Amino acid sequence: MGRNNRHKRGARNKRGPVRSERRPSLTGRVQLHEHSAYVITENGDYKVMGRGKREIMDGDTVAVSIKNSPHGERRAVIEGVVERAAISVVGTYQTAGPLGVIDPLDSRLKADFFILPEDTSADRLGVHPGDAVVARILTYPTRLESGAVTIERRIGGDDAPDLGVQYVMARYGYTDSYPEAALDEAEGLSLDVSAALKDPLRRDLRDRFVITIDPVDARDFDDAISLERTPEGGYKLGVHIADVSHYVAWDGHIDLEARHRTTSVYLADRVLPMLPERLSCDLCSLRPDEDRLAFTVDIELDAQGRVRHYDPYPSVIRSRVRMDYDGAEALLVRAGAVEYSMLEGAAEDVEAAEASREEALERGLACEEAARGYNVDLGDFLVAANELAELRRRIRRARGSVDFDTAEIRALLDEDGVPVQIVARERSCATSLIEEAMLLANECVAEWLADRDIEACYRVHEDPSPDSLHGAAVALAQLGIIDDRRAAGIALGSPDELQAAVDAAAGTANAPLVNTLLLRSMQRALYKPRNEGHFALAAPCYCHFTSPIRRYPDLVVHRVLKLQLAYEQLGGKDALVRTPRLIGKGRESLPRILPQICRACSDAERAADAASHATQKIKIAQYYEDRLGERYAGTVSWVSSMGLFVRLDLTQVEGLVSIKSLGNEWFEFDEDALTLTGADTGTRYELGQRVIIEVSRVNTTRGHLDFKLIH
């Protein structure tokens, strides 16, 4: 039996009054809405009662007690703020007598923020009334007092294109600047190949044919591959990763800042790098025709793609060709290894796509010509790599790996940061080719470390919870994607049934919805000091090894791997000499603080993903600001007490048809079936329903799209 709530122009509970009482204190995360606030706890989500809203901000961790309201609703009473999420606020500067006032850009904030009379930050930075600014919070608001801030920087007028992005950066505590001490340390670094090769662990691979394949607009290249067919019909795959650990010493200025950031953050209009550009875009970037230090994993596989042997070691490489994914795919199509998908849509869109493919082929042919200078047929190289990728994908599928087919929706911006197009970057044969190589290298390194019982930053993906799987199974069955037998298998966590559901929806209008439903039922992957396996990959051992330029856990893995190699191949005395630079010594050494590092990396990854998503939503909202009143076809992708979320066919962008806009009748929300049903007319809205909407309103600060249902 579904848990039902009845709604008319918003949420409302029809149960009678019950006795009000406080329940024991809980902690949770604040989630602000336009006219309400919720606390998300392990025990459920609770709406915040009126008092206390002034002192909380989105993302804060708070202590609450749960109180039954006179209408029977369980409400959260704020007992105190445990941890603040934001250290800055973005808003418009105004004056009120001797005080400066910051009017927050986030209309959900109920508190005021003042600049004290003695604060000269506005004059010092040339800020005038009406300017948008980033202000650092000095004291947080309470129920009785406003917050105090000081201006850190002027953004510009309130119509600045990056105003929303600056808001997100302030919300998550991100900055464009990098500490001077770390920058100075980076400028003092240099590459000395001769000195590096004196290390007996490092091997010279500069005579090996190595290539990089990345997005066409990539600026840093931290992974490369080499591949040879063996006489027995198998493969020798080399995965070569930038050797960041050679340059970044434990507890140095760069390391401390990288450990604080833990990840590069990819916002819609900029990248906030984990490492200084001197490293990420220069010394550690595997650019063509330049000697670079790398960490290599050589993997020998048989003709069926099964691993027979692997060997990790530091190296020196020289990339010969820099390819992009589209160019690589064009060569694979030309070789007959794969086919392009059929182009659909308006004539001008098809024409533009065809032109793009022709340009990609030209880039691919230029790379092919460069490879001939090394007596390598690049087409054959890519065909072999594609064959191996397909073999590895089959092996993963056979052992229970689940491949979710999701597209990355992003806004393309002009040089001023104004969105000009919405694109969906989907997986291609070329991206899969590299992805499979990186997955395999990660597995091999994790197994190498786990076999020796070595602690590191392992990537752990736990089994999904039965409750989450049950909800997804019910929704998929209602969509007609799966039958009852398959639903039962999904509810039990069968990887085969999960993959079958993804495959059944592939190529249909429901494919994005199915993938979203199943992804929501998964646990989030975490970093842990001990290996616990990876559910989605069906991998007994897994870690991140392949992106130390942008992920701190990868740098940790490189360090412990290099130290263990020294111990095994050169002896304990040599390893002892390397220890301070690689992992430190004493109370603040890597082994002592590894659990904290793993937790910090997991938390920072979650925040970076959220910030990236938020800025893309902002740019997408800016794109649709000029398209108010336009109508589009879409699919109901989610149903809640707030209304219907609709994903547009053309761009895969999602917006809300609020329950207020559906009419004046009562709507009954079935939380289990995920439906809204009109009490008077019986009109029913459900997942997967095809609709036509009109863009009715946009919020470019928070990246929200409001739709009006047409039919």
Where do the model's predicted regions map?
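Short, surface-exposed charged micro-motifs
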Residues: 27-29, 92, 224-226, 298, ...
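Conserved nucleotide-binding/hydrolysis micro-motifs of P-loop NTPases
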Residues: 69-70, 139-142, 157, 244-246, ...
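Helical mechanochemical/support elements of P-loop NTPase systems and associated helical scaffolds
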Residues: 74, 144-147, 161, 209, ...
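Charge-lined substrate channels and their catalytic hotspots, especially those that engage the 3′ end
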Residues: 2-238, 245-294, 320-323, 327-330, ...
